[in-house]
C-alpha cells in the first residue's frame, strides 16, 4: 500500500520537500489500532522495525514526498508572515473504506525551512497532551484531528528545561489552515492563492462547485462548521488556549493542541494559556475570537467575492453557533423543547454553578440522576446556596414533568452527553510525569477512560473525581 501525495504534487511550490530527521533511540510506544484500521493501513507498518525503516530508512520511499507547508497567521491579533510547518511534515494521504482522504502528518520530525532556527522537535509532554486531548474530544463527538501513533526517544531537547523529544503521526482531513489563504493573499501571490482554492475545491469542497458561487459556498461552509465547533467547545467546557488563525482548520475541527484545558470550576473568564496575559483566548471569548478569525480569513476571498457577499456569509456565524449551543445545552439538561422557559433554565443553571464555583462536569453528571418527583438531596447538597438550588430544581422538575419523557429514557440520554470522564490537566500531568520515567501505564489507563467518556465504571473512579486544590485551573505553557 502506498500513500497519495496530492498536496505535494499539485502545490509543491507552496512549501518544501523535507525528510524527517531520526531521533536518538526511537521507540514505538502507542498505536491507535481503531484509527489504523479505519484508514485501512497495514498492521505490518506499525511494528518497531517497520515504522523506523519507513520514517528514517535511507532507502525508504515512504518519505520521498514528505512535505512542510508554508503559511502565515494572525497571532494574538497581529499578522505574522513567517510561519509554516516548523516541526512537522505531511507524509501523505490515506483513504478510508469510504474513499475519503486523510492526511498523515509527522509531528516532531526535525528542522524544516520554516523552523525559524528552532530544533523542529516536539517534546514528550506536549505530544502526550495532544494524543490524550484529541482522543478525548473525538469520543465526546467534538470534531478534531486525531493521533495515530506515538514514538518516544532519548534525544534531549531544551525548552524551559531539558526534556525528551517525541514524535506523533497526526490524522486530519487536511492540514490546510486559515493561515494558508491569508499568507498568499497578504503576500500578493494571487496565482498561488487561486491554485490553493482550486485544490480545495477538487479535494475538500467539491460540493461547492455545484453552487452559483463556489467561493461563497466554501466560505459559508467554513463559517458554519467553525461556529458549530466552537459551540461544542463551549457546551463541553473546552478552552483551546491559542486560537491564532494558523491554528484554525478550514474543516471546522479542533487543531494544533497547545495550552488547552477543560474547565474545572465553572468560570467563563478562565484563561488556560499562561502567556495570554490579556485574556484574549479566555473561555468566554472563544465565540467572538472565532468570528474575528473568520473575518481575517475572509480577506483572502475578496478577489472572488463582493463585500456584501462576505458580510452575508459571516452573518451566519452567530445564528449557527447559538443554534448548536442551545441544542446541546438543552440535551445536557434533558430538555427537548426549544422555549423561552428552557433557555432561562439553562442560563440560571449556569449562573448557579458559576456563583457557587461548582465543577462544570460533575455538576452536569449529577443532574443526570434527578428524579422529577423526588427530593434529589445529592444535587441540593452539591451547592452552597441550597435555597437557590432548591428553587431552580423546582422549576426544572416542573419542566421535566411537562415534557412527559420517561425518566429512564431521559437519564440515559443525559448520561450519553454529559461525560463521566474529562481530561483534567492534573491527570494529564500525572501521566506525563510517569511516562517521562518510562512508565506509560497511567497514560494508557487515562487514554482508555477518555475513549469511553460516558461509561461510568467503579474501577476508574479516580478519573471522575474533582481535581485537588493544586490541580485546579492549571495554566499551561505554549512550549512544545
Curated annotation (Swiss-Prot):
Entry annotation: catalytic residues: 246 (proton acceptor)
Enzyme class: transferase
UniProt key word Nucleotidyltransferase: yes
Keyword Cell cycle attributed: no
Single GO molecular function: AMPylase activity
Keywords: ATP-binding, Magnesium, Manganese, Metal-binding, Nucleotide-binding, Nucleotidyltransferase, Transferase
Residue numbers binding ATP: 84, 86-87, 107, 119-120, 170, 177, 256
Protein name from the UniProt record: Protein nucleotidyltransferase YdiU
